[in-house]
């Protein structure tokens, strides 16, 4: 899948494919130490103040040491939890089971996601040295390219440039998986080509009028008129936040 490294303002400067660089492998980008990495899907809102909600896919690395403000996975009183490292008191002696390296939000309104991971072999599970409470949450072997890219010929990946969507926890340097084949709809999160520039916004229709909606009060909403050249370049199928780069 091609990678547009110049970013989408939240644009990249031109729709030309000249801005596409080499293809990107999400497994290589998001999983640095495969034998020490596990992936799970959040069953509830684990850390909403950091934008980690139910159904998010979370990638943890067991081989790296946590740094200040890293999000860590730990268990306490028989419960699996996430917390910022160093942000809470009373964590002395708590067993840390992994550092969050990436989080993935899938746009389930746009795509039917049929996720069938391969089972981990017993020896692979034992190498992770995890308690049962964590083991039972692991998805198994997953190919992030297959999970996140349903239509490879029509999909590209780009990086967010700016903070106009930070109210939805979509921030500067986050990755976007964008599918040009998906149909747009009221309320969709889309990469829009407006009057010669790209921008990332929600597309809302109110009384027959189209609006491009930011998620930051510092940015105005944009009313689309007949004189505007607006094209929906693609629908955001997933947003990837790299907690460790």
Model-derived regions: residue spans:
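Short, positionally conserved secondary-structure boundary motifs
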Residues: 1-48, 53-54, 64-68, 75-166, ...
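Structured core of small recognition/catalytic domains
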Residues: 160, 166, 171-179
């Amino acid at each position: 899948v091609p990678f547009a490294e110049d970013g989408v303002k939240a644009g990249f400067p031109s729709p030309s494919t000249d801005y596409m660089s080499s293809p990107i492998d999400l497994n290589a980008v998001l999983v640095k130490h495969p034998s020490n990495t596990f992936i799970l899907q959040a069953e509830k809102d684990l850390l909403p103040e950091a934008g980690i909600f139910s159904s998010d896919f979370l990638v943890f690395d067991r081989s790296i040491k946590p740094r200040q403000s890293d999000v860590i996975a730990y268990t306490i009183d028989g419960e699996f939890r996430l917390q910022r490292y160093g942000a809470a008191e009373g964590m002395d002696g708590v067993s840390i089971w992994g550092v969050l390296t990436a989080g993935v939000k899938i746009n389930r309104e746009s795509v039917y996601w049929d996720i069938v991971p391969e089972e981990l072999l017993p020896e692979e599970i034992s190498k992770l040295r995890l308690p049962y409470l964590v083991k039972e949450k692991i998805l198994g072997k997953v190919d992030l390219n297959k999970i996140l890219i349903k239509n490879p010929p029509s999909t590209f990946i780009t990086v967010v440039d700016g903070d106009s969507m930070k109210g939805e926890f979509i921030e500067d340097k986050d990755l976007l998986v964008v599918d040009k084949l998906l149909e747009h709809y009221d309320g969709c999160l889309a990469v829009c080509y407006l009057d010669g520039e790209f921008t990332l916004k929600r597309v809302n229709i109110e009384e027959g009028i189209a609006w491009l909606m930011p998620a930051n009060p510092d940015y105005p909403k944009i009313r689309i008129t007949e004189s505007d050249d607006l094209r929906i370049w693609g629908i955001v199928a997933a947003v990837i936040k790299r907690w460790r780069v």
